[in-house]
Design a protein with these regions (language model features):
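Membrane-interfacial helix-loop-helix
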Residues: 2-10, 17-54, 94-151, 158-161, ...
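Alpha-helical transmembrane segments of multipass membrane proteins
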Residues: 13-18, 61, 65, 96, ...
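Hydrophobic alpha-helical membrane segments of integral membrane proteins
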Residues: 48-91, 128-187
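Ubiquitous "structural anchor" signal
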Residues: 74-77, 89, 100, 104, ...
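C-terminal membrane module of polytopic membrane proteins
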Residues: 170-230
Length: 230
């Protein structure tokens, strides 16, 4: 139970957020035309520039500023809507993750290794010599919110995983998490679609948790089997 604690806490936070929003009625503040008018008008009148500025913010925020991953999905959903916003977020965070990977591999290897060693579980899981487990490990760490997004990106840079495999896996396995936060944000902002958005988000969260835990158990089984064969 202890090893799933962070994932369960994450799910609990989402549920509490939904309940508090219903009780405290945060949505009117977020949907107040006076608060959003300037931003929405700017995006509408400067759509291409808005996309460019968002991508720059996301790439820099993910690779240099070490902002929490959820930040980028929330901002994208608020600016562009949940679905197209998810796409822009996925593009930006993938580029940011790859940039972090490259910085770690070619410029910051020694310092990053010392930093990653402080997170025992991440260090143990990520640093595997068996290349057959690389995509499985990448899937687990992306699906389960138990490791810091930015630290993961730098950690993979000092492993043996290829940049092609890392890029493809990162792009694919970040999709569920980005959609969750994007539609969750839409549910808070848009009163009419709130219930449906929260239901979709909750279903995806549950599926992610189930799949992530299953994959983690599979990883532990394969690791134990490999050790026994030695």
């Amino acid at each position: 139970m202890k090893k799933y604690r962070k994932a369960l806490i994450f799910i609990l936070i989402i549920i509490i957020g939904v309940i508090l929003n219903r009780k405290l009625q945060w949505s009117p503040y977020l949907t107040d035309s006076n608060n959003l008018k300037i931003i929405t008008n700017f995006v509408r009148n400067n759509y291409i520039l808005s996309i460019f500025l968002y991508l720059v913010f996301t790439i820099v925020g993910a690779s240099i500023l070490a902002l929490p991953g959820v930040t980028f999905a929330v901002v994208a959903s608020g600016l562009f809507g949940p679905w197209i916003g998810s796409l822009y977020c996925l593009i930006g965070t993938t580029i940011g993750a790859v940039l972090s990977f490259l910085l770690s591999r070619y410029l910051l290897k020694n310092s990053i290794e010392e930093l990653v060693k402080k997170n025992d579980r991440l260090y143990t899981i990520v640093f595997q010599t068996d290349s057959k487990k690389e995509m499985l490990i990448l899937m687990i760490t992306r699906l389960l919110p138990i490791f810091p997004f930015n630290l993961q990106n730098y950690a993979y840079g000092i492993t043996n995983i290829s940049i092609v495999k890392y890029t493809i896996g990162t792009f694919l396995f970040m999709i569920p998490g980005i959609i969750i936060f994007s539609i969750g944000t839409e549910g808070i902002i848009n009163v009419e679609s709130r219930n449906s958005m929260f239901i979709i988000a909750l279903v995806i969260i549950i599926l992610m948790a189930i799949i992530g835990i299953y994959l983690y158990k599979k990883y532990k089984t394969l690791t134990a089997r490999g050790q026994n064969e030695r």
